[in-house]
Amino acid sequence: MHVSIALQRDALSALCRRFDIARLDIFGSAARATDFDPARSDADFLVKFKSDADEFSRFADFQDALGALLGRPVDLVERGAIEASRNYIRRRRILEEAQEIHAA
Protein backbone atom coordinates (compact mmCIF):
# COMPACT_ATOMS: atom_id res chain seq x y z
CA MET A 1 0.00 0.00 0.00
CA HIS A 2 1.33 3.43 -0.89
CA VAL A 3 2.53 5.39 2.13
CA SER A 4 0.18 8.33 1.42
CA ILE A 5 -2.77 5.95 1.88
CA ALA A 6 -1.26 4.02 4.79
CA LEU A 7 -0.79 7.24 6.75
CA GLN A 8 -4.55 7.82 6.53
CA ARG A 9 -5.52 4.36 7.84
CA ASP A 10 -6.99 5.59 11.16
CA ALA A 11 -8.97 8.34 9.42
CA LEU A 12 -10.19 5.82 6.83
CA SER A 13 -11.39 3.47 9.59
CA ALA A 14 -13.21 6.34 11.30
CA LEU A 15 -14.90 7.21 8.01
CA CYS A 16 -15.93 3.56 7.58
CA ARG A 17 -17.53 3.53 11.02
CA ARG A 18 -19.40 6.75 10.21
CA PHE A 19 -20.82 5.27 6.99
CA ASP A 20 -21.58 1.82 8.47
CA ILE A 21 -19.04 0.00 6.30
CA ALA A 22 -18.47 -3.70 7.01
CA ARG A 23 -15.27 -3.94 5.00
CA LEU A 24 -13.02 -1.67 2.94
CA ASP A 25 -10.07 -2.88 0.85
CA ILE A 26 -7.75 -0.99 -1.45
CA PHE A 27 -6.61 -2.43 -4.79
CA GLY A 28 -4.94 -1.27 -7.98
CA SER A 29 -1.88 0.97 -8.15
CA ALA A 30 -2.45 2.41 -4.66
CA ALA A 31 -2.28 -1.12 -3.22
CA ARG A 32 0.73 -2.14 -5.30
CA ALA A 33 2.53 1.18 -4.64
CA THR A 34 5.09 0.38 -7.35
CA ASP A 35 3.22 2.23 -10.12
CA PHE A 36 1.26 4.71 -7.96
CA ASP A 37 1.84 8.38 -8.83
CA PRO A 38 0.89 10.51 -5.79
CA ALA A 39 0.33 13.53 -8.03
CA ARG A 40 -1.98 11.86 -10.58
CA SER A 41 -3.19 8.41 -9.55
CA ASP A 42 -6.66 7.71 -8.27
CA ALA A 43 -7.35 5.23 -5.47
CA ASP A 44 -9.44 2.10 -6.06
CA PHE A 45 -11.46 0.61 -3.20
CA LEU A 46 -13.70 -2.40 -2.64
CA VAL A 47 -16.54 -1.70 -0.23
CA LYS A 48 -19.07 -3.84 1.60
CA PHE A 49 -21.86 -2.11 3.53
CA LYS A 50 -23.22 -3.57 6.76
CA SER A 51 -26.80 -3.23 5.54
CA ASP A 52 -28.60 -2.55 2.27
CA ALA A 53 -30.63 0.32 3.74
CA ASP A 54 -30.24 3.42 1.56
CA GLU A 55 -27.09 1.93 0.04
CA PHE A 56 -27.20 4.03 -3.15
CA SER A 57 -27.10 7.32 -1.27
CA ARG A 58 -24.43 6.09 1.15
CA PHE A 59 -22.33 4.79 -1.76
CA ALA A 60 -22.12 8.21 -3.42
CA ASP A 61 -21.64 10.05 -0.13
CA PHE A 62 -18.93 7.62 0.99
CA GLN A 63 -17.12 7.91 -2.35
CA ASP A 64 -17.15 11.72 -2.05
CA ALA A 65 -15.91 11.58 1.55
CA LEU A 66 -13.08 9.19 0.61
CA GLY A 67 -11.99 11.49 -2.20
CA ALA A 68 -12.06 14.52 0.09
CA LEU A 69 -10.05 12.72 2.79
CA LEU A 70 -7.40 11.48 0.38
CA GLY A 71 -7.35 14.55 -1.85
CA ARG A 72 -7.64 12.50 -5.02
CA PRO A 73 -10.25 10.84 -7.23
CA VAL A 74 -11.60 7.58 -5.85
CA ASP A 75 -13.11 4.61 -7.66
CA LEU A 76 -15.43 2.65 -5.39
CA VAL A 77 -16.58 -0.86 -6.34
CA GLU A 78 -18.93 -3.08 -4.38
CA ARG A 79 -17.04 -6.15 -3.20
CA GLY A 80 -20.00 -8.42 -3.96
CA ALA A 81 -19.98 -7.32 -7.61
CA ILE A 82 -16.36 -8.41 -7.99
CA GLU A 83 -16.91 -11.66 -6.09
CA ALA A 84 -19.85 -12.47 -8.38
CA SER A 85 -18.10 -11.41 -11.60
CA ARG A 86 -17.98 -14.02 -14.35
CA ASN A 87 -14.68 -12.53 -15.50
CA TYR A 88 -12.51 -14.82 -13.40
CA ILE A 89 -9.25 -13.17 -14.49
CA ARG A 90 -10.33 -9.73 -13.33
CA ARG A 91 -11.97 -11.18 -10.20
CA ARG A 92 -8.85 -13.11 -9.20
CA ARG A 93 -6.49 -10.18 -9.91
CA ILE A 94 -8.50 -7.68 -7.86
CA LEU A 95 -9.17 -10.00 -4.93
CA GLU A 96 -5.56 -11.21 -4.76
CA GLU A 97 -4.08 -7.71 -4.67
CA ALA A 98 -6.73 -6.20 -2.38
CA GLN A 99 -5.41 -5.05 0.99
CA GLU A 100 -7.73 -4.65 3.95
CA ILE A 101 -8.14 -1.15 5.33
CA HIS A 102 -11.12 -1.75 7.64
CA ALA A 103 -13.20 -4.71 8.81
CA ALA A 104 -16.04 -4.51 11.31
Label the predicted regions.
Residues 34-35, 39-44:
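A short, structured beta-strand/loop element
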Residues 46-48:
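Short hydrophobic/aromatic beta-strand micro-patches
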